[in-house]
Amino acid sequence: MPPTQAESVIRSIIREIGQECAAHGEIVSETLIAFMVKAVVLDPSNGFNMDRTLMKSDVQNLVKLCMTRLLDTKNPSLDTIKMQVYFDMNYTNRVEFLEEHHRVLESRLGSVTREITDNRACAKEELESLYRKIISYVLLRSGLGSPTDIKTVREVTAALQSIFPQAELGTFLTLSKKDKERQLKELTMIVTGIRLFNRDCGKGGEGIDDLPAVLHVAIPATMQHIDYQLETARSQVYRYTAILEKAANDPHMRAELQPYMLKEALYNIRQYEVFLQIILSDIITGAQEVEMMTKQLGAHLEQLKMTIKSKTAVPTSQVFPIFIALSTLWTSLQDETIVVGVLSNLFTHIQPFLGAHELYFPERAMQRHLNGATVKTDVCRMKEHMEDRVNVADFRKLEWLFPETTANFDKLLIQYRGFCAYTFAATDGLLLPGNPAIGILKYKEKYYTFNSKDAAYSFAENPEHYIDIVREKAKKNTELIQLLELHQQFETLIPYSQMRDADKHYIKPITKCESSTQTDTHILPPTIVRSYEWNEWELRRKAIKLANLHQKVTHSVQTDLSHLRRENCSQVYPPKDTSTQSMREDSTGVPRPQIYLAGLRGGKSEITDEVKVNLTRAVDET
């Protein structure tokens, strides 16, 4: 089937399932339906062949299976999938969220910015209207007050006129569009800095909230609430795990308990724990940023007070950079306020996905099943096997990593989110945290941890067997794909948040590094005393000399000539580059002498008659 035709079929299936769910009174998002369709197709028990074209009967069966799972509202597995889909669609890391937030603000200010930069005002009324638009722009961009508040507008107008009077609009209109936008941003930051300084001095700040005080109250309260929920979730995890471990050795308890349902509840609460840890980590990062920015804000305000004091005029080069820094810090505080609000809202909206716990596992039943069981925390489980370590000599073909031999040991991406792969495969889905101190197995560029030494040895005997078991289990319980981070094995179900963090899957362990050592020539400082004297008479001589110095007086002498001497200075012309040019060389072509002699050999006559012929050409002929 061509890709376009397959997409059309999938869209029609999703639309049909959505309509059927709505007819049964259940409103389901298309994202959740699409995820459920892929989950049903992946489950081998449903009998769908991925390499074969779906027939009409297959489509009807697929719709029926999806409807059954989506309408089973009291199923922990469905709640986990809903939680995962909601979190993936609504969570963004801090950096990307703030970038998107700033982009949205810029787009909202686009129309106001264009009205200012494209303005061609000439008349007085038009210039006044343009100036009012600039005031509105400054207010909207800074987010400190409403443009409809008269007091706020007056305060902004006064601050703007002190740095950008209306008379300078003519110069502003001659600038290019980019320069206008840049100047508008600078004016906004300077005006914001002036208002913040006036607010700190008690002379203004109309409509400006005390963001540091608000954040110092909101962040600890949010962290405390999330911490409480996180501890409650972990307590529930430990109790579920203890009951499942007890049921593994008690057939009667297994028949009564329905372990598969309890395991789905365990996956649900474990996923909730993971999401709470992500949210809490972001809030802790925000708290650290707020603390640092609050200190910087106070330092800048104090610097401004020391610079201005009671002066009537201060150079702009001294105060404008501080005003801009104040504005930047305040904008960052505004960003932190929004981030905390979004994270708190996300935390509130994932809590309803835990509703099935009280329904299927009430407190009374839990206490009855826990009778005689030992509830262990994750930390306790790790401490039990802290001293048990894998012996590398037992494995010649496998590589094991340990904290003392791996530089980035804590940064390695552990498979299955750090849970023990052997325990999960051997117990049909029980989640126990792995202990990295036992040793991390590196197998095909992936890293695995185990909760005990025996589990590590068992997994190392046949890793592929246990990896296949985990993969098949994830096909039946699709929520495990995101919980155990199996996205690379099921690329069709990779969530958007995992696609953005794809680079983190390629962190390699650092087990070797270049190093060098050098021995100091003298480790200890020298102890030789140069002024030491062993001769008694030399010591006596120095003592007499020092005693005589007490009776001496320092004198100065000046002659008749020396008092006239003074420091002298001379001045010369600085060197400069010069050049000379000689007469140019020339040449002339003189004729070559050509003189011939005849009759030197003599002849019949007794007298030799010598003839000299000069054939040299004249100078003017050359």
UniProtKB/Swiss-Prot annotation:
Q: Where do the segments described as Disordered lie? A: 571-592
Q: Where in the cell is it found?
A: Cytoplasm, Cytoskeleton, Cilium axoneme; Cytoplasm, Cytoskeleton, Cilium basal body
Q: Which Pfam families match?
A: FAP206 (PF12018)
- Extract the InterPro entries matched here: FAP206
- UniProt KW Nucleotide-binding keyword: no
Write out the entry's keywords from A to Z: Cell projection, Cilium, Cilium biogenesis/degradation, Cytoplasm, Cytoskeleton
Cellular component aspect of the GO annotation: axoneme; ciliary basal body; motile cilium; radial spoke
Principal localization reads cytoplasm
- GO BP annotations listed: axoneme assembly; cilium movement; regulation of cilium beat frequency; regulation of flagellated sperm motility; sperm axoneme assembly
Report the coiled-coil segments: none
Write out the similarity annotation. Answer: Belongs to the CFAP206 family.
The protein's role, per its UniProt record: Essential for sperm motility and is involved in the regulation of the beating frequency of motile cilia on the epithelial cells of the respiratory tract. Required for the establishment of radial spokes in sperm flagella.
State the protein's name: Cilia- and flagella-associated protein 206
Q: Which organism is it from?
A: Macaca fascicularis (Crab-eating macaque)
Q: What is the lineage of its organism?
A: Eukaryota, Metazoa, Chordata, Craniata, Vertebrata
Q: Which gene encodes it?
A: CFAP206
